[in-house]
Swiss-Prot record:
Its main location: nucleus. It comes from Vanderwaltozyma polyspora (strain ATCC 22028 / DSM 70294 / BCRC 21397 / CBS 2163 / NBRC 10782 / NRRL Y-8283 / UCD 57-17). The lineage of its organism: Eukaryota, Fungi, Dikarya, Ascomycota, Saccharomycotina. Belongs to the UTP25 family. GO terms for cellular component: nucleolus; small-subunit processome. Residues 42-58, 101-139 have a biased composition (Acidic residues). Residues 1-140 are annotated as: Disordered. PANTHER family: ORF PROTEIN-RELATED, U3 SMALL NUCLEOLAR RNA-ASSOCIATED PROTEIN 25 HOMOLOG. InterPro entries: P-loop_NTPase, UTP25, UTP25_C, UTP25_NTPase-like. This is U3 small nucleolar RNA-associated protein 25. Keywords: Nucleus, Ribonucleoprotein, Ribosome biogenesis, rRNA processing. DEAD-box RNA helicase-like protein required for pre-18S rRNA processing, specifically at sites A0, A1, and A2. It comes from the Eukaryota. Component of the ribosomal small subunit (SSU) processome composed of at least 40 protein subunits and snoRNA U3. One of its GO terms (molecular function) is U3 snoRNA binding.
Amino acid sequence: MARHSGTSEGPKKRGRTELRSIRRPNRSQHSKHDQQVVHESENEDSLESSSDDDEDIAQAEAENSDRKEKVYGALLTILNSEHPERKKHKSHSTDFVKEIDEQEEIEQGMASESEEEDEENDEEESNEGDEEEEEEPTDQLDTFESHFNDVSQDLVDDISAGFKDKQIKYKSMKYSLDKKESAIFGKPLLLTQQDETIDNPVLTSSYDSYFIKQRLKIQNDLLDSSKENLTPLKKKLLDPMFQYKDVLCEYTNYENDEKEYRELYSLHVLNHIYKTRDKILKDNQRLQENDDLECLDQGFTRPKVLIVVPTRDTAYQVVETIIEKSGLDQIDKKGKFKDQFFDDSLPPTSKPKSFRHVFKGNTNDFFVLGMKFTRKAIKLYSNFYQSDIIICSPLGIQMILENTDKKKRQDDFLSSIEVMIVDQLHSIEYQNISHVYTILEHINKIPQQQREADFSRIRMWYINDQAKFLRQTMLFTRYISPTANAIINGKCHNMAGRWKNNQIISSEDSSIGQLGIKIKQIFQRFDLVGGTVVDESDYRFKYFTSVVMQNIVKSTGYEDGILVYIPEYTDYMRLRNYMKEKTTILFSEINEYSTQKQLDSNRSMFQQGRTKVLLYTERLHHYRRYELKGIKSVIFYKPPTNPEFYNEVIRFTAKNAFLGKSDINISTIRTVYSKLDGLALQRIVGSKRAAILCHGQNESYDFK
């Protein structure tokens, strides 16, 4: 029997802590995933196509996450952040956060709508006939009208039936954005239409080509097209975004890029809300003149935009950007909002820059906030059913959608969402990605209760349960992952098609190119001979235990100081149990569920050489960014999704060598991978090298 230090059996807590944990099902028990679409991408290189299998794995895993154990009783526990090394918040802010009842705050958003309805009706009556006229662009139809109002119901019926009967195939085209980036546009077509060519996407890179409300043009200085000064990121996103296509955007800079795409989508959603509202008011006036007119201009409920973000700090930035772009000065409950969402505390400067960015400010991940727009004001904390925009964390909205108290469970307010945005998807993946899938399961469903809606004005594609084929979904992430691809490919069925960018990473810009350390790096590939993509985890485990484990036992490098880095928690538990039951290796283990005592004790024993191997999870590294000591060699059970983690972990060995405790010429870095790891490998070794690693004849490649 193996001897190991620490007994980290995983979490036994319930409530929010459990819901923050990541569970993945045993792939041997994998159930069939809804493979409604056959994906095709013309002119894509072999590496891009090889990542499709990885997308299927991620999609199957996320959809089968087991949520039966969620318990509501401990909801109000654990308000603290999952990374205690951050600087403490200011005392007044901490006291306030401890006092508020977050669950009650969310439930207030589901309260009776009657008071706001009366106020809203009064306001609409006083403002009818006060709509603005936009200047019509000469080179483009109004995409709001063409996508939502003028779309052929027969076409919607055909697409809907095609997805249902699995008769849809995406036809794609690829085009270059610049030397380091390309874009792929795909559109769903019936199998009977596959001989047709899809039109080239309209690329104008100009606000002037779209119907933007006059008040927004004035506020954002867009009246003169010569003053647009669009950044490269805004230029490539403007057209697919304002054409209501689905978007999967991988950006490169935490600070500037996030600010830029938020400015763009804030303008887009404001324009969408204003146009929706003004159309209803115009139709109200038309119906007063002729009540026999058919005016289909509404959904079941008012909310039209859902923005999903990881933390309150991100929510604060999003709301502030929307307020700035709107130009409205009257903001109801802004003081309360700042008290509950803003925090100027920062993580320690010793942490990496990316960590300080992700975990700055208020990192609380439990909230849902409604935003209601009137002619002269923005009302924060509005009732969800009377809101135009809902901003939430995955955990916060999960507690409404799948509340264990069935009387409090609701999803009707998501029935008429027309634009959904997931901001910082890469951070949300480290929380609990299954909550995003939960949202996608509940969005655009026909309401269970009859709301205050005029059914004579509800669009037919809402009544026919076809809203998901018109909904625009936009995902913004620092790194495109198999999960991100699975969401955009498997859960988004927008008739307008989908757009995503692809970074072309040179060897110089890769992790290895930026490492700055000469150390032996070995990449070992295992193949899925006769297996399917859902068997990949089993093949990896078998390869690791039969091949890589022998190197640990034989100690070809050092007798101790071996770090095994494991991205997936389920893989970590499987390997941990194997080493405990089937080997005699002395090992320590630390993961995201370890107590502080276990973390300190096991790290200390490993550093002192009392244990040979340290098992270390990626999620723990994401939340803590430990400076691990005593590392002489590293084994990556799977390539890290975040390429920064690859270099950070390797530098542990360099620091150990610098202290004279090891020889870097003897140290080795070993990475186990399959062809399904192409996305992660591109960022680590570069796009061209990754293609060779995935499809070359050799099974092992060395770098130094």
